[in-house]
Amino acid sequence: MSSTTQAPEPVYQWTADEAVQFLKEWNFSLGIILLFITIILQFGYTSRSMFIYVVKMIILWLMWPLTIVLCIFNCVYALNNVYLGFSIVFTIVSIVIWIMYFVNSIRLFIRTGSWWSFNPETNNLMCIDMKGTVYVRPIIEDYHTLTATIIRGHLYMQGVKLGTGFSLSDLPAYVTVAKVSHLCTYKRAFLDKVDGVSGFAVYVKSKVGNYRLPSNKPSGADTALLRI
């Protein structure tokens, strides 16, 4: 009996003319998509528009799973062994970083109880207790001082509007910034009134420890800390 061997299927490769033709057909759509993403990433700040910032977070959140899918696709349809090796490495790195993101986000969520813990941009969450309600917002940098401003009843923390109906007397003695591995406590060091309904307070970092925010707080009390 004679055995027949099947010839390997040829690997299709794009030509330069096909690549140019693809860009000509999809150039306008790709340009609009990239322009939209660029505008969102450039102007997506909590101090400007919370809606645009949330859209920015969604785009950033989708980047890693999209990268993992593309890396796996490259592994399945690798052009040669060199491309296959790099694709496997990139896939492993992407999956490991994606898992680390979820682990850190869950740890931060346990510490704060806020869904902002899954913010892909930063692991710093600023927490301020106003009349028993804890406001949590992400901040990009690890600041040595934090500024709370009240303008005619409107509360701003680091330039981000948190709520209305507050006065300078409602500002707590302490503000916290939660991180994955620890929690920073900021003590109020300065308070100044501009007029009867406006003013600001400066908080200075005073303590760092392994704490979490309590789930229940009495109205008007300063934020307490629970060790974990």
Curated annotation (Swiss-Prot):
It is a multi-pass membrane protein. It holds the Pfam family CoV_M. Its main location: virion. O-linked glycans consist of Gal-GalNAc disaccharides which are modified with up to 2 sialic acid residues (done in recombinantly expressed E1 glycoprotein in SAC(-) cells infected with recombinant vaccinia vector). Keywords: Glycoprotein, Host Golgi apparatus, Host membrane, Host-virus interaction, Membrane, Transmembrane, Transmembrane helix, Viral envelope protein, Viral immunoevasion, Viral matrix protein, Virion. It is found in: Virion membrane; Host Golgi apparatus membrane. Residues 2-25, 78-85 are virion surface. Component of the viral envelope that plays a central role in virus morphogenesis and assembly via its interactions with other viral proteins. HAMAP family: BETA_CORONA_M. This is Membrane protein. It comes from Murine coronavirus (strain A59). The lineage of its organism: Viruses, Riboviria, Orthornavirae, Pisuviricota, Pisoniviricetes.
